[in-house]
């Protein structure tokens, strides 16, 4: 179940509620929010993949039901974005960067189809463990782990969020397995 916090128009309360059981019978793959506070839910139901957008108010005052803005069936490359995917929402571009092994995909999530071509391909052996962005969303920071590297196996790569081009030299072998990349303004 997905529980949301906010105003429940059915009983005029602020609390956690189970999205009116809308997602019962579905396997939840990932949940994320867009720049406007709308919740996007990627699910599987009966071997079909769906992207559902829930309005930021969660409930419709007209129907007192979950405010489903849209639900789209995804039919292309559906398994690339999965429960193990590391992802980062880029609000200015209305896209989602997500990792699969050593590749980063850039999905414009207002389109239901997931791209088949990687936006960024990291060197062989690198496995994406975490991502973050600069405050202006122009740089994407990718923390990786390479089990075949001697010594420290964690690395940091920095890319331009718009072009996918590498910025500077990678910081290879600078950490153990990274779990989080943080951006700090100087």
Ranges and model annotations:
Residues 1-6, 46-55, 101-108, 149-158:
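Structural motif
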Residues 7-12, 55-58, 108-113, 160-164:
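Short loop/turn segments that connect beta-strands within beta-propeller blades
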Residues 119-170:
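C-terminal structured domain segments
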Residues 1-26, 31-35, 40-41:
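Solenoidal tandem-repeat scaffolds enriched in leucines and small polar residues
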Residues 36-38, 92-94, 136-138:
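Short coil/turn segments that connect the beta-strands within blades of beta-propeller domains
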Residues 12-23, 60-78, 114-123, 165-171:
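A short beta-strand motif characteristic of beta-propeller blades
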Residues 41-43, 97-98, 142:
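Residue position within the beta-strands of beta-propeller blades
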Residues 23-36, 71-89, 125-133, 170-186:
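Repeated scaffold domains used in trafficking and secretory/extracellular systems
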């Amino acid at each position: 179940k997905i529980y949301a916090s906010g105003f429940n128009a059915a009983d005029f309360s602020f609390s956690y509620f189970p999205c009116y059981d809308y997602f019962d019978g579905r396997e939840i793959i990932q949940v994320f929010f867009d720049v406007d506070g709308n919740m996007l839910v990627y699910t599987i139901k009966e071997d079909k993949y769906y992207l559902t957008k829930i309005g930021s108010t969660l409930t419709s005052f007209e129907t007192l039901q979950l405010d489903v803005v849209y639900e789209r069936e995804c039919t292309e490359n559906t398994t690339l974005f999965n429960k193990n995917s590391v992802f980062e929402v880029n609000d200015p571009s209305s896209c989602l960067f997500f990792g699969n092994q050593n590749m980063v995909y850039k999905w414009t999530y207002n389109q239901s189809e997931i791209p088949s071509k990687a936006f960024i391909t990291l060197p062989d052996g690198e496995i994406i463990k975490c991502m973050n962005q600069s405050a202006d969303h122009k740089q994407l920071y990718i923390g990786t782990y390479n089990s075949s590297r001697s010594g420290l196996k964690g690395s940091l790569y920095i890319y331009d969020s718009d072009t996918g081009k590498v910025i500077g030299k990678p910081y290879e072998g600078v950490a153990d397995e990274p779990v989080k990349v943080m951006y700090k303004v100087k």
